[in-house]
UniProtKB/Swiss-Prot annotation:
Native source species: Mycoplasma pneumoniae (strain ATCC 29342 / M129 / Subtype 1)
Pfam families according to UniProt: Pkinase
Family: Belongs to the protein kinase superfamily. Ser/Thr protein kinase family.
CDD domains attached to this UniProt entry: STKc_PknB_like
Enzyme class: transferase
PANTHER family recorded: CELL CYCLE SERINE_THREONINE-PROTEIN KINASE CDC5_MSD2, SERINE/THREONINE-PROTEIN KINASE PLK
Lineage, uppermost ranks: Bacteria, Bacillati, Mycoplasmatota, Mycoplasmoidales, Mycoplasmoidaceae
Gene3D superfamilies: Phosphorylase Kinase, domain 1, Transferase(Phosphotransferase) domain 1
Stated name of the protein: Putative serine/threonine-protein kinase
Length: 389
C-alpha cells in the first residue's frame, strides 16, 4: 500500500502523527509526532521524548532488491552515529509499519521509519528569511560547528556523505546557541579501501537540491556490464554545498542564479563549471578576504580552479581557524569569469525572451550602429570640405 500517513494516524501503536514537516529524496517523508508512551520515561526524559520526528521511507518500483538492501544497510550505518550537532536517532523500524488510521489497521510493506529527536528551533532557512544574512562573527561560529559535524561523518570507515546540505536541513536549538544537522534521506554510506569503492545507496537517480549540488553529480562512468552509471559520491559533494551555504549566510543569496525553467536543472548545476563564484565584497563591505577564499576553495570545480579545491574538511577547518589573518584573493578579480558578464549574450539566445523582444533588441542595436556610422561619415565629409575650402 502506498504511503499516505495523515494527521491523527497512530504508527506502531506508539506515535501519533501531528503534521507533515517536509518531503525529501528517495520517497522520504518527515512527520512531527507525539509519543503515546511518554509516561514510561522519567521526568528528565519526558521533555525530550514527548515530541519526536518520524522519517518514513517507502520503497518504490525504481529501487531493485540489491539497492534496497544497500539503502537499509546505509540507514543502519547512519543511525549508529552520535554527535552533539546531529539530530539524535532513537529507533529504526523496518521492513513494515503498522498504522491505525480511522479505526482501521493498515500495514505498509517495504517501509523504513527512523525515530529522531525533535529540535524546537528555527531552521537556517527560516533565520535567513528573517535576518537576510548573519554577522561575520555569527557565520564563523555556526559554520565552524557545521563543518566539524560533516568532518565527523566523513571520518568513518563507512564514510557518510550527506549529499543534501542546505539551510532547510540545518536546525538551531531554541536558544540559538547551537545547531543540529538533519535529514540523511539521501545520504551515501561509502566504503573505501585499496581495492574498490562500494556505495551503500542507490546512485542512479539524481538526488539533492539544485542550488547546492556540485556539477560532479552529473559525471558518469561505465560499469563492468557496459552500463553507464553515476560516479560514486565523494566528500567534495558536501564541501561544495558547504561553500554555497557559507556564501548564503554572508550575503543572503546563493552564488549562481537558478534557471527559470525547472526542466533545465542541469544547466543550473553546471554554472559552477562555467563561472567563478562572485565576490561577496561587492555585495557586502565587511566580508574578509579569508572567507572569500574559503568559499572559492569549496566551490572550485572549474577545470582551471580545481587545484585549489579542498580535498577534505580538515583543510577547510584549518582555514576557518585562520579566518582573521590578512590574506589576498587566491584568484584575482581580473581573472574571474562571472555569470553576469555574459548576461546580454544569454538574453539574446535565451528561449525565455520572446522573439519580438529579441528582434527589438537587434533593431535597437542596429539603429545605434547605423547612427554612429552616419555621424562618423558626416564628420569626415564636413572636415574634408572645410580643409579643401
Amino acid at each position: 500500500m502506498a504511503l499516505n500517513l495523515k494527521i491523527g494516524d497512530i504508527v506502531q501503536n506508539k506515535y501519533r502523527i501531528e503534521k507533515l514537516i517536509n518531503r525529501g529524496g528517495m520517497n522520504s517523508y518527515l512527520f512531527l509526532a507525539s509519543n503515546l508512551h511518554v509516561q514510561e520515561f522519567g521526568p528528565l526524559q519526558k521533555r525530550q521524548f514527548t515530541r519526536l520526528v518520524l522519517k518514513v521511507v517507502q520503497r518504490t518500483d525504481k529501487i531493485n532488491d540489491n539497492n534496497w538492501k544497500k539503502f537499509l544497510d546505509g540507514t543502519i550505518t547512519t543511525t549508529r552515529v552520535s554527535h552533539k550537532n546531529l539530530v539524535q536517532t532513537f529507533d529504526v523500524v523496518s521492513p513494515r509499519l503498522s498504522v491505525l488510521s480511522e479505526n482501521q489497521v493498515i500495514v505498509l510493506e517495504d517501509t523504513v521509519m527512523i525515530v529522531m529527536e525533535y529540535v524546537d528551533g528555527p531552521s537556517l532557512r527560516e533565520m535567513l528569511n528573517q535576518k537576510g544574512y548573519f554577522s561575520v562573527q555569527e557565520v564563523v561560529y555556526y559554520f565552524t560547528k557545521l563543518v566539524k559535524v560533516i568532518n565527523y561523518l566523513h571520518s568513518f570507515e563507512h564514510q557518510i556523505i550527506h549529499r543534501d546540505l542546505k539551510p532547510e536541513n540545518i536546525l538551531f536549538t531554541s536558544n540559538l546557541t547551537d545547531i543540529k544537522l538533519l535529514d540523511f534521506g539521501i545520504a551515501s554510506a561509502v566504503i573505501r579501501n585499496a581495492e574498490k569503492t562500494e556505495v551503500l545507496t542507490d546512485e542512479n537517480s539524481l538526488f539533492g537540491t539544485v542550488s547546492y549540488m556540485t556539477p560532479e553529480v552529473l559525471e558518469s562512468t561505465v560499469n563492468k556490464e557496459g552500463k553507464r552509471i553515476r560516479k560514486p559520491p565523494t566528500v567534495q559533494y558536501d564541501i561544495y554545498s558547504l561553500g554555497v551555504i557559507l556564501f548564503e549566510m554572508l550575503v543572503g543569496r546563493v552564488p549562481f542564479n537558478k534557471s527559470i525553467d525547472p526542466k533545465k536543472e542541469r544547466e543550473t548545476i553546471q554554472k559552477a563549471r562555467n563561472f567563478d563564484v562572485p565576490l561577496m565584497g561587492n555585495l557586502r563591505s565587511d566580508v574578509p578576504v579569508s572567507l572569500e577564499n574559503i568559499v572559492f576553495k569549496c566551490t572550485a570545480v572549474k577545470r582551471e580552479n580545481s587545484k585549489w579545491m579542498y580535498s577534505d574538511t580538515k583543510q577547510l577547518l584549518a582555514d576557518l581557524a585562520q579566518w582573521q589573518t590578512e590574506q589576498t584573493l587566491i584568484k584575482p578579480v581580473h581573472e574571474r569569469i562571472l555569470e553576469g558578464q555574459n548576461e546580454m549574450r544569454e538574453l539574446m539566445v535565451s528561449n525565455y525572451l520572446p522573439w519580438y523582444l529579441r528582434k527589438g533588441v537587434l533593431i535597437f542595436f542596429s539603429v545605434v550602429l547605423l547612427a554612429l556610422l552616419i555621424a562618423v561619415v558626416s564628420f569626415f565629409i564636413i572636415t574634408g570640405v572645410v580643409v579643401h575650402s
